[in-house]
UniProtKB/Swiss-Prot annotation:
Protein name: Heat-inducible transcription repressor HrcA
Keyword Repressor: yes
A Pfam family per the record: HrcA
Family: Belongs to the HrcA family.
Gene: hrcA
Record-linked Gene3D superfamilies: 3.30.450.40, Heat-inducible transcription repressor hrca homolog, domain 3, Winged helix-like DNA-binding domain superfamily/Winged helix DNA-binding domain
Length: 325
Protein backbone atom coordinates (compact mmCIF):
# COMPACT_ATOMS: atom_id res chain seq x y z
CA UNK A 1 0.00 0.00 0.00
CA UNK A 2 1.49 3.33 -1.06
CA UNK A 3 1.55 6.17 1.47
CA UNK A 4 0.61 9.77 0.75
CA UNK A 5 4.25 10.86 1.09
CA UNK A 6 5.36 8.16 -1.34
CA UNK A 7 2.64 9.27 -3.77
CA UNK A 8 3.86 12.88 -3.53
CA UNK A 9 7.44 11.76 -4.16
CA UNK A 10 6.36 9.63 -7.14
CA UNK A 11 4.44 12.57 -8.63
CA UNK A 12 7.49 14.82 -8.24
CA UNK A 13 9.77 12.22 -9.85
CA UNK A 14 7.42 11.78 -12.81
CA UNK A 15 7.19 15.53 -13.42
CA UNK A 16 10.96 16.03 -13.07
CA UNK A 17 11.68 13.05 -15.33
CA UNK A 18 9.36 14.48 -18.01
CA UNK A 19 11.05 17.90 -17.71
CA UNK A 20 14.67 16.70 -17.58
CA UNK A 21 14.57 13.42 -19.50
CA UNK A 22 16.93 11.67 -17.10
CA UNK A 23 16.76 9.59 -13.88
CA UNK A 24 16.05 11.65 -10.76
CA UNK A 25 18.17 11.44 -7.61
CA UNK A 26 17.20 12.27 -4.03
CA UNK A 27 19.28 15.47 -3.80
CA UNK A 28 17.87 16.85 -7.07
CA UNK A 29 14.37 16.06 -5.83
CA UNK A 30 14.90 17.95 -2.57
CA UNK A 31 16.50 20.94 -4.33
CA UNK A 32 13.80 21.28 -7.00
CA UNK A 33 10.83 20.81 -4.68
CA UNK A 34 12.24 22.28 -1.43
CA UNK A 35 11.28 19.16 0.51
CA UNK A 36 11.68 19.43 4.27
CA UNK A 37 13.07 15.91 4.72
CA UNK A 38 16.55 14.40 4.67
CA UNK A 39 18.12 12.82 1.57
CA UNK A 40 18.24 9.52 3.48
CA UNK A 41 14.47 9.61 4.00
CA UNK A 42 13.89 10.35 0.31
CA UNK A 43 16.25 7.52 -0.71
CA UNK A 44 14.39 5.11 1.56
CA UNK A 45 11.02 6.13 0.13
CA UNK A 46 12.38 5.82 -3.41
CA UNK A 47 13.62 2.31 -2.58
CA UNK A 48 10.13 1.43 -1.33
CA UNK A 49 8.61 2.78 -4.55
CA UNK A 50 11.11 0.70 -6.53
CA UNK A 51 10.11 -2.43 -4.58
CA UNK A 52 6.48 -1.64 -5.44
CA UNK A 53 7.47 -1.49 -9.15
CA UNK A 54 6.59 2.20 -9.47
CA UNK A 55 10.23 3.24 -10.07
CA UNK A 56 13.13 1.73 -12.00
CA UNK A 57 16.86 2.05 -11.33
CA UNK A 58 19.41 2.07 -14.14
CA UNK A 59 22.95 0.76 -13.73
CA UNK A 60 24.48 3.92 -15.18
CA UNK A 61 22.81 6.33 -12.73
CA UNK A 62 22.11 6.59 -9.03
CA UNK A 63 18.76 8.17 -9.82
CA UNK A 64 15.47 6.50 -10.64
CA UNK A 65 12.91 6.83 -13.40
CA UNK A 66 9.18 6.02 -13.44
CA UNK A 67 8.10 2.58 -14.65
CA UNK A 68 4.94 2.07 -16.71
CA UNK A 69 3.19 1.28 -13.40
CA UNK A 70 4.50 4.55 -11.97
CA UNK A 71 3.21 6.55 -14.91
CA UNK A 72 -0.10 4.68 -14.61
CA UNK A 73 -0.56 5.66 -10.97
CA UNK A 74 0.42 9.27 -11.70
CA UNK A 75 -2.04 9.50 -14.60
CA UNK A 76 -4.86 7.91 -12.59
CA UNK A 77 -4.46 10.67 -10.00
CA UNK A 78 -4.66 13.32 -12.73
CA UNK A 79 -7.78 11.78 -14.24
CA UNK A 80 -9.53 11.77 -10.87
CA UNK A 81 -8.96 15.53 -10.68
CA UNK A 82 -10.33 16.10 -14.18
CA UNK A 83 -13.85 17.45 -14.52
CA UNK A 84 -15.76 17.15 -17.78
CA UNK A 85 -17.82 20.32 -17.40
CA UNK A 86 -19.35 21.55 -20.65
CA UNK A 87 -19.21 25.20 -19.59
CA UNK A 88 -15.50 25.38 -20.49
CA UNK A 89 -15.81 23.62 -23.83
CA UNK A 90 -14.39 25.27 -26.92
CA UNK A 91 -16.53 24.90 -30.05
CA UNK A 92 -13.41 24.96 -32.23
CA UNK A 93 -14.51 22.17 -34.55
CA UNK A 94 -17.75 23.93 -35.42
CA UNK A 95 -15.73 27.07 -36.22
CA UNK A 96 -13.39 25.06 -38.48
CA UNK A 97 -16.35 23.45 -40.23
CA UNK A 98 -17.73 26.88 -41.14
CA UNK A 99 -14.29 28.19 -42.14
CA UNK A 100 -13.84 25.17 -44.45
CA UNK A 101 -17.27 25.57 -46.08
CA UNK A 102 -18.70 22.50 -44.29
CA UNK A 103 -16.03 20.20 -45.72
CA UNK A 104 -15.56 17.78 -42.80
CA UNK A 105 -12.34 16.26 -44.17
CA UNK A 106 -10.65 19.66 -44.47
CA UNK A 107 -11.91 20.74 -41.04
CA UNK A 108 -10.58 17.57 -39.37
CA UNK A 109 -7.23 17.84 -41.16
CA UNK A 110 -6.82 21.41 -39.89
CA UNK A 111 -7.95 20.30 -36.43
CA UNK A 112 -5.39 17.46 -36.24
CA UNK A 113 -2.53 19.80 -37.14
CA UNK A 114 -3.77 22.57 -34.85
CA UNK A 115 -4.05 20.19 -31.90
CA UNK A 116 -0.56 18.84 -32.62
CA UNK A 117 0.84 22.38 -32.51
CA UNK A 118 -0.83 23.02 -29.14
CA UNK A 119 0.06 19.68 -27.54
CA UNK A 120 3.54 19.35 -29.14
CA UNK A 121 2.77 15.70 -29.87
CA UNK A 122 1.32 13.72 -32.78
CA UNK A 123 -2.47 13.60 -33.08
CA UNK A 124 -4.97 11.29 -34.75
CA UNK A 125 -8.53 12.30 -35.57
CA UNK A 126 -11.04 9.73 -36.82
CA UNK A 127 -13.82 10.96 -39.08
CA UNK A 128 -17.40 10.41 -37.82
CA UNK A 129 -19.05 7.27 -39.14
CA UNK A 130 -21.32 7.95 -42.10
CA UNK A 131 -23.98 5.89 -40.33
CA UNK A 132 -24.24 8.88 -37.99
CA UNK A 133 -23.73 11.46 -40.76
CA UNK A 134 -26.99 10.83 -42.64
CA UNK A 135 -27.59 12.02 -46.20
CA UNK A 136 -30.13 14.83 -46.18
CA UNK A 137 -30.45 15.62 -49.88
CA UNK A 138 -29.05 14.56 -53.24
CA UNK A 139 -29.09 16.83 -56.29
CA UNK A 140 -28.25 16.01 -59.92
CA UNK A 141 -27.26 18.92 -62.15
CA UNK A 142 -26.52 18.67 -65.89
CA UNK A 143 -23.25 20.49 -66.65
CA UNK A 144 -23.11 19.72 -70.38
CA UNK A 145 -24.06 16.96 -72.81
CA UNK A 146 -21.64 14.44 -71.27
CA UNK A 147 -21.11 15.52 -67.64
CA UNK A 148 -23.47 15.69 -64.66
CA UNK A 149 -22.69 16.97 -61.18
CA UNK A 150 -23.87 14.96 -58.18
CA UNK A 151 -24.24 17.04 -55.00
CA UNK A 152 -24.66 15.27 -51.63
CA UNK A 153 -25.78 17.30 -48.60
CA UNK A 154 -25.46 15.65 -45.16
CA UNK A 155 -27.47 16.50 -42.07
CA UNK A 156 -24.35 18.11 -40.57
CA UNK A 157 -24.34 20.70 -43.37
CA UNK A 158 -21.31 19.00 -44.97
CA UNK A 159 -21.52 19.12 -48.79
CA UNK A 160 -19.74 16.91 -51.34
CA UNK A 161 -19.93 16.98 -55.11
CA UNK A 162 -18.80 14.60 -57.84
CA UNK A 163 -18.55 14.74 -61.63
CA UNK A 164 -20.34 11.95 -63.49
CA UNK A 165 -19.67 11.02 -67.11
CA UNK A 166 -23.04 10.29 -68.69
CA UNK A 167 -24.53 10.96 -72.12
CA UNK A 168 -28.00 9.93 -70.93
CA UNK A 169 -30.57 12.48 -72.07
CA UNK A 170 -32.71 13.53 -69.12
CA UNK A 171 -34.95 16.57 -68.72
CA UNK A 172 -34.57 18.92 -65.76
CA UNK A 173 -37.81 17.57 -64.29
CA UNK A 174 -36.57 13.99 -64.59
CA UNK A 175 -33.25 14.86 -62.93
CA UNK A 176 -35.21 16.38 -60.04
CA UNK A 177 -37.36 13.23 -59.82
CA UNK A 178 -34.27 10.97 -59.73
CA UNK A 179 -32.64 13.25 -57.13
CA UNK A 180 -35.74 13.03 -54.94
CA UNK A 181 -35.91 9.25 -55.36
CA UNK A 182 -32.32 8.82 -54.15
CA UNK A 183 -32.83 11.34 -51.32
CA UNK A 184 -36.00 9.68 -50.05
CA UNK A 185 -34.83 6.06 -50.08
CA UNK A 186 -32.39 4.10 -47.97
CA UNK A 187 -29.63 3.71 -50.54
CA UNK A 188 -27.85 0.82 -48.83
CA UNK A 189 -27.42 -1.73 -51.62
CA UNK A 190 -30.04 -4.49 -51.37
CA UNK A 191 -32.39 -6.57 -53.51
CA UNK A 192 -35.27 -4.43 -52.24
CA UNK A 193 -33.59 -1.24 -53.46
CA UNK A 194 -32.83 -2.83 -56.84
CA UNK A 195 -36.53 -3.66 -57.24
CA UNK A 196 -37.48 -0.08 -56.33
CA UNK A 197 -35.05 1.35 -58.87
CA UNK A 198 -36.29 -1.02 -61.56
CA UNK A 199 -39.90 0.05 -60.93
CA UNK A 200 -38.99 3.75 -60.85
CA UNK A 201 -36.72 3.87 -63.93
CA UNK A 202 -38.20 4.77 -67.32
CA UNK A 203 -35.66 2.70 -69.28
CA UNK A 204 -32.86 0.18 -68.91
CA UNK A 205 -30.35 3.00 -69.40
CA UNK A 206 -31.94 5.04 -66.62
CA UNK A 207 -32.03 1.96 -64.36
CA UNK A 208 -28.28 1.46 -64.92
CA UNK A 209 -27.60 5.18 -64.37
CA UNK A 210 -29.35 5.22 -60.97
CA UNK A 211 -27.69 1.96 -59.88
CA UNK A 212 -24.27 3.38 -60.80
CA UNK A 213 -24.94 6.46 -58.65
CA UNK A 214 -26.07 4.34 -55.69
CA UNK A 215 -22.96 2.12 -55.95
CA UNK A 216 -20.69 5.17 -56.16
CA UNK A 217 -22.25 6.79 -53.07
CA UNK A 218 -21.99 3.55 -51.07
CA UNK A 219 -18.35 3.05 -52.09
CA UNK A 220 -17.51 6.62 -51.11
CA UNK A 221 -19.27 6.29 -47.74
CA UNK A 222 -17.40 3.05 -46.99
CA UNK A 223 -14.01 4.66 -47.70
CA UNK A 224 -14.75 7.87 -45.80
CA UNK A 225 -15.97 6.06 -42.66
CA UNK A 226 -12.43 4.86 -41.93
CA UNK A 227 -10.65 8.14 -42.68
CA UNK A 228 -7.96 9.07 -40.18
CA UNK A 229 -6.20 12.43 -40.10
CA UNK A 230 -2.69 12.44 -38.65
CA UNK A 231 -1.06 15.63 -37.47
CA UNK A 232 2.50 16.23 -36.30
CA UNK A 233 4.04 12.81 -36.94
CA UNK A 234 7.46 14.47 -36.98
CA UNK A 235 6.88 15.65 -33.38
CA UNK A 236 6.49 12.05 -32.25
CA UNK A 237 9.61 10.99 -34.16
CA UNK A 238 11.59 13.84 -32.58
CA UNK A 239 10.40 12.90 -29.09
CA UNK A 240 11.24 9.23 -29.57
CA UNK A 241 14.65 10.06 -31.05
CA UNK A 242 15.60 11.50 -27.69
CA UNK A 243 14.77 8.29 -25.84
CA UNK A 244 14.84 5.21 -28.03
CA UNK A 245 15.59 5.29 -31.75
CA UNK A 246 14.93 1.56 -32.18
CA UNK A 247 11.31 1.97 -31.08
CA UNK A 248 10.34 4.35 -33.90
CA UNK A 249 9.69 1.83 -36.69
CA UNK A 250 7.27 -0.49 -34.82
CA UNK A 251 5.42 2.54 -33.44
CA UNK A 252 4.96 4.09 -36.89
CA UNK A 253 3.84 0.72 -38.25
CA UNK A 254 1.26 0.52 -35.48
CA UNK A 255 -0.05 4.03 -36.18
CA UNK A 256 -0.43 3.23 -39.87
CA UNK A 257 -2.22 -0.09 -39.27
CA UNK A 258 -5.86 -0.91 -38.61
CA UNK A 259 -5.01 -1.71 -34.98
CA UNK A 260 -4.96 1.98 -34.05
CA UNK A 261 -8.37 2.44 -35.70
CA UNK A 262 -9.75 -0.49 -33.73
CA UNK A 263 -8.36 0.99 -30.51
CA UNK A 264 -9.90 4.41 -31.14
CA UNK A 265 -13.26 2.94 -32.11
CA UNK A 266 -13.56 1.39 -28.65
CA UNK A 267 -14.00 4.91 -27.27
CA UNK A 268 -17.70 5.26 -26.47
CA UNK A 269 -17.84 8.07 -23.91
CA UNK A 270 -16.66 11.65 -23.53
CA UNK A 271 -14.27 10.59 -20.76
CA UNK A 272 -10.57 11.06 -21.33
CA UNK A 273 -8.72 7.75 -21.43
CA UNK A 274 -4.98 7.15 -21.21
CA UNK A 275 -3.19 4.00 -22.35
CA UNK A 276 0.49 3.59 -21.55
CA UNK A 277 3.05 1.36 -23.27
CA UNK A 278 2.04 -2.30 -23.31
CA UNK A 279 -1.54 -1.35 -22.39
CA UNK A 280 -1.76 -0.23 -26.03
CA UNK A 281 -0.06 -3.25 -27.57
CA UNK A 282 2.33 -5.91 -26.28
CA UNK A 283 4.91 -4.83 -28.87
CA UNK A 284 4.95 -1.21 -27.68
CA UNK A 285 6.63 0.18 -24.58
CA UNK A 286 7.68 3.72 -25.37
CA UNK A 287 4.48 5.60 -26.20
CA UNK A 288 1.28 6.70 -24.53
CA UNK A 289 -2.05 7.51 -26.17
CA UNK A 290 -4.53 9.96 -24.64
CA UNK A 291 -7.97 9.59 -26.21
CA UNK A 292 -11.32 11.32 -26.11
CA UNK A 293 -14.29 12.18 -28.32
CA UNK A 294 -15.06 15.32 -30.31
CA UNK A 295 -18.45 16.56 -31.44
CA UNK A 296 -20.03 18.51 -34.28
CA UNK A 297 -23.18 20.32 -33.14
CA UNK A 298 -23.91 17.58 -30.56
CA UNK A 299 -25.06 15.28 -33.38
CA UNK A 300 -21.87 13.87 -34.92
CA UNK A 301 -18.99 12.48 -32.91
CA UNK A 302 -15.65 10.89 -33.63
CA UNK A 303 -12.48 9.89 -31.82
CA UNK A 304 -9.36 11.90 -31.18
CA UNK A 305 -5.97 10.83 -29.82
CA UNK A 306 -2.77 12.55 -28.75
CA UNK A 307 0.27 10.29 -29.09
CA UNK A 308 3.60 10.90 -27.41
CA UNK A 309 6.37 9.21 -25.42
CA UNK A 310 5.54 7.62 -22.07
CA UNK A 311 7.30 10.63 -20.54
CA UNK A 312 4.49 12.84 -21.83
CA UNK A 313 3.26 16.08 -20.30
CA UNK A 314 0.03 14.36 -19.33
CA UNK A 315 -1.46 17.25 -17.39
CA UNK A 316 -1.18 19.64 -20.35
CA UNK A 317 -2.65 17.10 -22.79
CA UNK A 318 -5.53 16.15 -20.50
CA UNK A 319 -6.39 19.81 -19.92
CA UNK A 320 -6.27 20.46 -23.67
CA UNK A 321 -8.58 17.54 -24.52
CA UNK A 322 -10.87 18.49 -21.66
CA UNK A 323 -11.59 21.79 -23.42
CA UNK A 324 -12.65 20.18 -26.70
CA UNK A 325 -16.29 19.56 -27.46
Amino acid sequence: MITQRQLSILNAIVEDYVDLGQPIGSKALIDRHHLDVSPATIRNEMKQLEDLNFLEKTHSSSGRSPSEEGFRLYVDQLLKQTSRQNKNKIQRLNQLLIENHYDISSALSYFANELSMKSHYATLVVRPKHSEEMINNVHLIKANDSIMILVIIYNSGHVEHFHLNSALELSSDRLIAISNFISNNNIEISAKLSDKIRSFANSNEENQFINDIVKMINSHISKQSNSIFLGGKVKLIDALNESNVSSIQPILQYLESERITELLQTISTNDINVKIGKEIDESLSDISIVTSQYHFDNSLKGQIAVIGPTAMRYQNVIQLLNQIW
